Amino acid sequence: MEYKKTLNMPKSGFPMRAGLPKREPEMLRYWEQLDLYNELLKKNEGKPLFSLHDGPPFSNGALHMGHALNKALKDFINRSYAMRGYYTPYIPGWDNHGMPIESAIIKQNKLNHKAMSVAEFRSACHQFADHYIDVQREGFKRMGVVADWDHPYKTMDPGFEAREVRVFGQMYKNGHIYKGLKPVYWCPHDETALAEAEIEYQDDPCTTVYVKFPMNDDLGKLPHLDKSKLSFVIWTTTIWTLPGNLAIALHPDESYAVVKAPNGEMYIMAEALTEKVMGIGGFDRYEIVETHPGSFYENMLASHPFLPKTSRLVLADYVTMDSGTGCVHTAPGFGADDYQTCLRYGMDMVVPVDDQGRHTDYAGKYAGMKTEESNPVILQDMKEAGSLFASQEIVHSYPHCWRCKKPIIFRATPQWFCSVESFKDDAIAACEDVRWVPSWGKDRLRSMVLERTDWCISRQRRWGLPIPVFYCKDCGKPICTDETIDAIAGLFEKKGSNAWFEMEAEDMLPEGFTCPHCGKSAGFEKESDTLDGWFDSGSTHYAAMERDQGFWPATMYIEGLDQYRGWFQSSLLVAVGALGRGAPFKECLTHGWTVDGQGRAMHKSLGNGMDPAEIFNKYGADLLRLWAGSSDYHVDVRCSDDIFKQLSQNYLKFRNTAKFCLDNLTGFDPEQLVAAADMQELDRWAVTRLNSLIRRVFDSYDAYEFHAVSHAINDFCVVDLSSFYFDIIKDRLYCDGENSLSRRSAQTALFLILDAMTRMFAPILAFTCEEIWLAMPHRSADDSRSVLFNCMVQPYEDYALPEDAMDRWARIAAVRSAVNGALEQARADKTIGKSLEAEVDVTVPAEDAFLADMDADTLADLLIVSQVRVTVGDALTVTVAPAQGVKCARCWKVLTSVGTVAGHDTLCPRCAAVVKSLPVVE
């Protein structure tokens, strides 16, 4: 007889090879036919709400690994909440306006954008943005992200624009928006103001200079000193700003020394910095003639080093003694502190640089030069004039534009601002009501809000939402009222914001409208600037989430670390400043950057980038999801081909675990689970270990520690199942009677394990777990259409073993490990071949004496040997010898009982009984 046919051999239609690149698109089609997103909402309708508000990516390019990490984490969160009984609407969004789109379309199409009409340019931008929305959407769908992809929000949609106009109007009405001449970050290349979040710092070489400003008027306070030899020494790293100097700032309470050099010249500088500065000037000998507090010099005048004007001595508390000379070069057109200080002293604003970064006529001979071109010329002029005290070549961190990557300048221009100071305390207080992950996020955002100046919200661009303000041609004052806001919002709702550029001001305003300031109706002009893109995205919680979905605040925001300065902050400021509410999110979670395998930023120039589309085609989306779900995203997340190859091995361990369960559950009815009292203790041990895994996974999902979920499931598959439990139960599964209690006991454990693991891992391994779910048997209460329609299971407490029993199994595992080591050595010594050819003698210490009382056949099965003897001694020892008896032709155990059942000379009694119970086998 061919006894192989009498075995319960593993069989299922679940393939060992994943073939994810081919299989996943089939699953996507299945989900589309199922209408997965809407069916999920129907399934959980009426349950507690979990709302993750999507931070909108720019629609200006294909997916990159940062996009993939972000959307994967969002999908993990939404799926895990859905499977824990929450209603999880998720509307994806895109940020469409601003420089990223303009720069991309100009670069791609090589357009002379200044020669295009506004309508032509905006139409091109709109088409470009729409194209990349489609590109990115298809990439996110390929990842398996569950969302309302047919109804995303877009910041360029007319409805969104209309609502954003109302946000602006409310913030204006609240007194938080004004127009003023103040220094802002300015990009000369793109000719626009920039927000702080649009600045990147790079290390640049630079010439730093120490410059002499000769004393001009000492107010009669220093009659004993020769004024012709007395100078204040300032220090700067931006030579080009010197033509704009109007003042020198000193700290009122610090001591300032008059220092006499061997050449007879005298220099005024902070006493605390004298040794350092004089050393830089090449003086190892000098004399401190006298000292005075900074306040002593207030309102004195110094002569400009190379222009025919004076510089006033002013006081400022921000002057520090950690660098420079303690005498701070002050140019109100180029610095926020400088501006405020000069404003306090009633000095006029001077901005000697134009939109393109060229000096104006105010700068004299340097007029027409770009700022970077003027640096060496000014330096040479100061050398020739004898006004250069010293210079040094250094490398310093300097701000650059995030789009064009070129250096920016700080320049005073007329701009629209949001006065953050007026509601800063409320914004900071709102942070207290938020759960921050990680916890230090609260302090980071609080400190940024605390330190920030007023928010420059205007941009000199054409592709953006127009600032909805009119100007009266008669009195010149700006107009923004409830009436005008209602008119513009209604117009944009119907025609979009292009109407602003296509219609005359009078045609947009209500009939008979008059200026609220002067009462005239002679005519009106439109504001030409557009809103900062951060105002767009900062308004999404109102313009998209609340108005479209009907809830506020969001349960969660999750974005990269840079969004403390960007979207998190702009959303908070809009919520507090415009709506008068708290934070627009209850929880705020952040993740790190994606970097290459060596921890470097990924750049085209380095050739170290990874394309999500290539990963889909080579490994499958589930491997990309596993990468995101196995990484500690609180720090920078590394990605490389080697990392994905290693993840493939981890993936196969889980897949093979699932396949083992599925193969051995063929024909099993989950409605007929074996009761705990009837299960073998080993099977209850496996379920008890599963219970521990369930608790760890639930805790990890609650903490958004997805890497802990992945690692815990991987460890369970490798350590508890593959290396221990599965090996032991194979004999029972294959050789015991198909419907025997012993086999059904093991199948019950396998079902509970597979069912729980598939549900727990489904938020991360979405495609594979769905494939498993569709292949496995189910209970009648389950929704067999999708694993996502089912809740994660709670621990099976009825099956749990008590703690003392689990301790006993830990000792059994330790003994088994020692036996395995001895078996390996015996195989190496050619004493035995397979472990079933062995007989082992085990000596155990007194604390393991319970092993001597165990049924010998049961213990032999646990150790996967044919025979075992246990004695109690001083320490654990194992001796291996060939088993005595005959090899069973069916189960391959070597036993003395083989052939003792009549008619079955080559079988052991167990196998003989099983074969006798079967129908006749040919």
Q: Across the structure, where does each feature detected by a protein language model lie?
A:
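Protease-associated
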Residues: A247, E254-C327, A336-Q340
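Short cysteine-rich clusters marking metal-coordination/redox-active sites
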Residues: C187, C401, C472, C515-C518, ...
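Residues immediately within or flanking Cys/His clusters that coordinate Zn2+
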Residues: V184, Y398, I467-V469, G512, ...
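Cys/His-coordinated zinc-binding microdomains
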Residues: E191, Q460, G476, G519, ...
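Acidic, turn-prone loop/beta-hairpin segments
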Residues: D95, V184, P188, L194-E200, ...
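Alpha-helical recognition segments enriched in aromatics with Gly/Pro capping
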Residues: R312, Y345-G357, R461-W463, D486-D636
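Residue patterns forming the tRNA-binding/recognition surfaces of aminoacyl-tRNA synthetases
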Residues: E2-L20, E26, Y30-L34, I106-P243, ...
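N-terminal catalytic cores of NTP/NDP-binding nucleotidyl/phosphoryl-transfer enzymes
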Residues: K42-S103, E164, I234-L242, V314-T341, ...
